[in-house]
């Protein structure tokens, strides 16, 4: 077994490692936490022990035992590394901002073994804005999710494995098949920053899709100075800005960030750049700041002082995907029942109606066989898919359904209103909801559209041309591409989303692609031109990209043949009018089941898994099933050929795995769905791989079709899988 030399503060220590589960960067979001708990459940029959251990900066004692004192009965050694200062990922305390709400209502963002109300322990928000809404339909404030994840991690004794402020900078694969991690440890005192290297046998990455902010660099206008750095921030930094300037207290009753002694600095003008859901939230927050909503937890604002409404300039470029569609907070089920909109989306009913779900229509097909012909006839696919998507009449009615939804959501928002200077027309989404690439969100803030329609909100459909400083003040001057210059602005917030790559250096460079991860490569390589031959890039990277190009071409032909019109966006989709200007682009993730690298699968290597590289409206419903699949893969549970109703990954050829991965990538590209998945369809596939039934609701076909799948539908799947495989 490997030994680790950890270098820090001029001293060397030697530790013993059996397994190191690393989930880095945002490990402590949903995916990382449930992965750690599930892996320990699968590998250690005594987990969780009753012993409660708190987080420490030390290496666990089990790492210090000499090699010859370890036995096969020792507990699994496990570490969870986090570059931030607290757990929670998106819901970490340092990332919360005043009106941050989950896109999930109560019951949909929790683990199956512990409800959100259990973690609250009687604590409630004195300023909660939706007390008249039934509890099960309330959208969850960010602070509650932060508190929930902390309580749940304590229940499963996870703090003892956590290491905060440990940033993984480099990952290498050694000839011994170990993983080498270069780490920078950032303590509270910058002068104490140190570097170290550790080794591990098994590695899980769970940074998710929101780890690297997409920060745009704006040049100043000619003859003007650059804008002050503190006046141009990303949406990720809004929470710290609110703590410093408005006395924001993220967790009610917890004085971790006391109100500032200096007077609060309420901005006069704020500019917000972007059209995704986060931009809607930020516009709402600043537009209603003068109302001093107690649910914002702004302790720096004196309740007796009058505050002028903040002038909010909302800038959305005129090209690209446009503003997001915003669903009403409640929607109707087929039986007429009105429930939270996110719960409607967590039913099979919506999945089968969506053209974004790759459901094969029922059909006869030829499959390879061991008989003398080498082929056999087989029936595959879904009758519902044949009825709804496999014929012109079905597609017509599906299209009518989504067009009716367009009108319903548009009427709710008031896009056609001639009032307010017609500014609501600027927020009309570019494409229909039926287009899989259309950005979506839920208008779950109180008085959401009223705040947007208010006279202190100004909407501009143009790109930012330049951002400059002002010599006589600390404000910024923003020039737009349509020749508009905004009034002097105190704060520019980039609600520009996230980059799709993992923020770690992999060595050698081709390792990134070999692990199935996204890699920043020259655009000319991804879209070959005559000049592509002149682009300097690692030969192995170029070889891998061209290898996948050939497979993708075959996959595209097959998908168009099987899915017909559903394999492409509707004819009325408006393409982006903004030509790409960056000479680099990110290659797609190529992960089998969105988790494992095809190259490692072929080699029989069960040491690496990536989690959270799926885009879904119901993260918690996916996370628990993904975690079990990952644990099964890492421990050889998917190599078992004795269970005939489960996946035997050893029985799959490399070409089978590559075809599956390629079709997943090509489907995302052709339809516009990208990394998005239909939650229940994806979970069904993983559960079938594990030999478990995907149908968890019972009560017959209609009940299965219309019931809301919450995480509790998957309660007990770890024990169910262990029993099926004879594991203690």
Curated annotation (Swiss-Prot):
Q: Where is this region: Disordered?
A: 50-72
Keyword hit for Phosphoprotein: no
Pathway membership of this protein? Secondary metabolite metabolism
Which EC class does it fall in?
oxidoreductase
Q: Please give the cofactor(s) recorded in the UniProt entry for this protein.
A: FAD
**Keywords, ordered alphabetically:** FAD, Flavoprotein, Membrane, Monooxygenase, NADP, Oxidoreductase, Transmembrane, Transmembrane helix
Q: Where is the composition biased (Polar residues)?
A: 50-64
Mark the transmembrane ranges.
17-37
Q: Note the topology in the membrane.
A: Single-pass membrane protein
Cellular compartments annotated:
Membrane
GO cellular component terms listed in the entry, alphabetical order: membrane
> Which amino acid positions bind NADP(+), per UniProt?
490-491
The entry lists its GO molecular-function terms as: monooxygenase activity
Residues annotated for FAD binding in this entry:
168
- EC number from the UniProt entry: 1.-.-.-
Q: Which Gene3D superfamilies match?
A: FAD/NAD(P)-binding domain
Disulphide linkage map: none
PANTHER family given in the database record: DIMETHYLANILINE MONOOXYGENASE
Entry's family note: Belongs to the FAD-binding monooxygenase family.
- What is the annotated role of this protein in its UniProt record? Multifunctional FAD-dependent monooxygenase; part of the cluster that mediates the biosynthesis of a highly modified cyclo-arginine-tryptophan dipeptide (cRW). Within the pathway, avaB uses the avaA cyclo-arginine-tryptophan dipeptide (cRW) as substrate to generate the cyclo-Arg-formylkynurenine diketopiperazine (DKP). AvaB also catalyzes an additional N-oxidation of the avaC product which is followed by cyclization and dehydration.
Name it. Answer: FAD-dependent monooxygenase avaB
């Amino acid at each position: 077994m490997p030994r680790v030399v950890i270098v820090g503060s001029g001293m060397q220590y030697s530790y013993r490692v059996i397994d190191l589960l690393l989930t880095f960067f945002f490990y402590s979001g949903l995916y990382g936490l449930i992965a750690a708990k599930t892996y320990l459940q699968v590998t250690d029959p005594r987990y969780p022990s009753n012993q409660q251990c708190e987080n420490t900066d030390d290496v666990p004692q089990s790492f210090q035992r000499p090699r010859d004192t370890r036995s096969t009965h020792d507990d699994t050694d496990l570490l969870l590394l986090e570059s931030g200062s607290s757990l929670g990922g998106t819901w970490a305390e340092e990332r919360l901002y005043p009106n941050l709400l989950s896109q999930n209502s109560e019951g949909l963002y929790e683990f199956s073994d512990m409800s959100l109300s259990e973690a609250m322990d009687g604590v409630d928000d004195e300023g909660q804005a939706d007390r008249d809404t039934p509890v099960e339909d309330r959208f969850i404030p960010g602070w509650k999710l932060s508190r929930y994840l902390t309580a749940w991690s304590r229940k499963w004794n996870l703090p003892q494995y956590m290491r905060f402020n440990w940033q993984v900078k480099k990952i290498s694969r050694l000839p011994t098949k170990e993983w080498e991690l270069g780490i920078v440890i950032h303590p509270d005192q910058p002068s104490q920053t140190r570097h170290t290297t550790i080794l591990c046998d098994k590695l899980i990455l769970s940074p998710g899709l929101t780890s690297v902010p997409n920060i745009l660099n704006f040049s100043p206008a000619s003859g003007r100075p650059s804008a002050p750095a503190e006046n141009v921030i990303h949406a990720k930094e809004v929470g710290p800005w609110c703590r410093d300037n408005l006395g924001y207290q993220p967790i009610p009753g917890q004085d971790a960030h006391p109100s500032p002694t200096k007077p609060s600095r309420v901005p006069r003008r704020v500019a917000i750049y972007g059209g995704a859901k986060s931009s809607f939230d930020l516009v709402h927050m600043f537009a209603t700041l003068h109302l001093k909503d107690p649910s914002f937890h702004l302790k720096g604002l004196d309740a007796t002082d009058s505050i002028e409404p903040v002038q909010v300039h909302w800038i959305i470029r005129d090209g690209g995907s446009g503003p997001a569609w915003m669903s009403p907070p409640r929607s109707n089920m087929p039986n007429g029942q009105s429930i939270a909109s996110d719960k409607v989306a967590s039913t099979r009913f919506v999945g089968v109606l969506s053209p974004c779900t790759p459901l094969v229509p029922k059909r006869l097909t030829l499959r390879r066989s061991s008989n003398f012909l080498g082929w056999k006839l087989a029936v595959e696919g879904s009758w519902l898919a044949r009825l709804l998507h496999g014929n012109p009449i079905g597609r017509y009615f599906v299209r009518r359904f989504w067009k009716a939804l367009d009108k319903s959501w548009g009427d709710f928002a008031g896009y056609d209103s001639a009032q307010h200077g017609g500014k609501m027309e600027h927020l009309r989404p570019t494409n229909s909801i039926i287009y899989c690439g259309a950005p979506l969100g839920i208008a779950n803030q109180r008085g959401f559209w009223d705040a947007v329609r208010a006279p202190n909100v100004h909407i501009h459909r143009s790109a930012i041309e330049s951002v400059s400083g002002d010599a006589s003040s600390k404000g910024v001057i923003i020039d737009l591409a349509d020749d508009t210059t905004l009034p002097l602005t105190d704060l520019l917030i980039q609600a520009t989303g996230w980059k799709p790559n993992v923020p770690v250096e992999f060595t050698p460079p081709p390792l990134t692609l070999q692990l199935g991860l996204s890699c920043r490569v020259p655009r000319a390589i991804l879209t070959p031109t005559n000049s592509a031959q002149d682009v300097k890039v690692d030969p192995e990277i170029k070889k891998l990209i061209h290898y996948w190009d050939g497979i993708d071409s075959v996959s595209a032909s097959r998908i168009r043949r099987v899915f017909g019109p559903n394999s492409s966006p509707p004819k009325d989709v408006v393409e982006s009018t903004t030509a790409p200007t960056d000479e680099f682009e990110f290659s797609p993730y190529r992960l089998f089941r969105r988790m494992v690298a095809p190259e490692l699968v072929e080699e029989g290597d069960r040491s690496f898994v990536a989690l959270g590289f799926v885009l879904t409206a119901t993260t918690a419903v996916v996370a628990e099933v993904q975690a079990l699949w990952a644990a099964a893969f890492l421990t050889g549970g998917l190599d078992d050929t004795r269970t005939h109703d489960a996946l035997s990954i050893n029985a799959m050829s490399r070409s089978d795995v590559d075809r599956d991965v390629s079709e997943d990538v090509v489907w995302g590209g052709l339809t516009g769905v990208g990394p998005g998945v239909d939650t229940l369809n994806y979970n069904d596939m993983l559960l079938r791989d594990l030999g478990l039934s995907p149908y968890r609701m019972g009560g017959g076909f209609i009940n299965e079709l219309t019931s809301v799948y919450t995480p509790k539908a998957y309660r007990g799947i770890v024990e169910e899988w262990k029993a099926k495989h004879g594991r203690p």
